């Protein structure tokens, strides 16, 4: 019988972080590096736990090389060929593989390709198993299969939005569970399927479930600005995956388009018409597109955006009195709000000029 849960679920836009007394004198005093030991692989991670999404307009080899300079992670999209992987490995800095994951679906072809790439590139340490609906039994079985084949690799898996499924994926072999259904800027699942979960509440609940098993969670989607990234960490996310904020740069995928003397880059969801026609030839007759395609202003080199995101996180830590990023979730108190910002002069803002690549 249908039922309604009456407890309100919250998104990033519904809250702000309350400022608290702080002993920090400067944002420069904040330490963003985290160190994790993963439950199943037993491997140790050290870095800044911001992650570029495994979309083909974001998770590129070029993005991985650029973000590695900041100790930021990249999940490489799954549509690179084995030969492209080998060419990248031949030219990449060895330490890039400390901040990089190979992504895979769960089909037989995906399994074959995953095995081939890992055989050719033994330096790979991370595997990202990515499906839109992480609640299927076939997905759980695939995680078990990968864990059995690669016991020392760290496995990211998702997406789900509820605690009981987080526990299921961790107990099946996942080290990091990706949390988020429908919050992304170019995702339309909530409109097409009517399914989803507000991202802040999803992260709060899933982090609680994962941490009880010594597992980890990655908030995936819904961050439209650096403040949202800080809120995700404050809600208990161990990693925060970003798509749209990393799109539109020199290192991003997507076609560069000129219109009326201005430059734009194409950005689209991986379940959009654009993505399915590009990678599969058409949209299967039994399904609907659950993503959209947009043109976003060209942003130049990604390093400027990285500085903006990390600066925002440092500022949030300073306001809440968290000297280390790991303290932010302990220091965070969220207040519900009816309005976040004063948008009086938004139509008159001077646009940022993209910084050229070096």
UniProtKB/Swiss-Prot annotation:
GO terms for cellular component: GMP reductase complex. Signal peptide: none annotated. Homotetramer. The keyword Metal-binding applies. It is an enzyme of class 1 (oxidoreductase). One of its GO terms (molecular function) is metal ion binding. The lineage of its organism: Eukaryota, Metazoa, Ecdysozoa, Nematoda, Chromadorea. It comes from Caenorhabditis elegans. Its EC number is 1.7.1.7. PROSITE patterns: IMP_DH_GMP_RED. Gene3D superfamilies: Aldolase class I. This is GMP reductase. CDD domains: IMPDH (cd00381). Keywords: Metal-binding, NADP, Oxidoreductase, Potassium, Purine metabolism. PANTHER family: GMP REDUCTASE (PTHR43170:SF5). Belongs to the IMPDH/GMPR family. GuaC type 1 subfamily. Catalyzes the irreversible NADPH-dependent deamination of GMP to IMP. It functions in the conversion of nucleobase, nucleoside and nucleotide derivatives of G to A nucleotides, and in maintaining the intracellular balance of A and G nucleotides.
């Amino acid at each position: 019988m249908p039922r309604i849960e009456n407890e309100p679920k919250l998104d990033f836009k519904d809250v702000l972080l309350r400022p608290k007394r702080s002993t920090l004198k400067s944002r420069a005093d904040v330490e963003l590096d985290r160190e994790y030991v993963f439950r199943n692989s037993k491997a140790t991670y050290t870095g800044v736990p911001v992650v570029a999404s495994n979309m083909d307009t974001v998770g590129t080899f070029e993005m991985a090389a650029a973000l590695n300079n900041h100790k930021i992670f990249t999940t490489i999209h799954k549509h690179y060929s084995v030969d492209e992987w080998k060419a990248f490995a031949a030219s990449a800095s060895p330490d890039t593989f400390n901040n990089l994951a190979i992504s895979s679906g769960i089909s037989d072809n995906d399994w074959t390709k995953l095995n081939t790439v890992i055989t050719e590139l033994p330096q790979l340490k991370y595997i990202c198993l990515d499906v839109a609906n992480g609640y299927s039994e076939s997905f759980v079985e695939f995680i078990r299969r990968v864990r059995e084949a690669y016991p020392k690799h760290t496995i990211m898996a998702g997406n789900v939005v509820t605690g009981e499924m987080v526990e299921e994926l961790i107990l099946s072999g996942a080290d990091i569970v990706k949390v988020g259904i429908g919050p992304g800027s170019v995702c339309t699942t909530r409109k097409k399927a009517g399914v989803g979960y507000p991202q802040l509440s999803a992260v709060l609940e899933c982090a609680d479930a994962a941490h009880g098993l010594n597992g980890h969670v990655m908030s995936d989607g819904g961050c439209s600005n650096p403040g949202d990234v800080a809120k995700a960490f404050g809600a208990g996310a161990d990693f925060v995956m970003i798509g749209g904020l990393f799109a539109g740069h020199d290192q991003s995928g997507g076609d560069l388009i000129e219109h009326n003397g201005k430059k734009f880059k194409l950005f689209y969801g991986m379940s959009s018409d654009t993505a399915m026609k590009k990678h599969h030839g058409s949209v299967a007759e039994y399904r609907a597109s659950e993503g959209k395609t947009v043109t976003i202003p060209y942003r130049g080199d990604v390093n400027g955006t990285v500085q903006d995101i990390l600066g925002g996180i440092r500022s949030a830590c300073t306001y809440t009195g968290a000297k280390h990023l790991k303290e932010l979730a302990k220091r965070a108190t969220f207040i519900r709000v009816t309005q976040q910002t004063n948008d009086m002069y938004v139509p008159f803002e001077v646009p940022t000029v993209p910084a050229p690549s070096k």
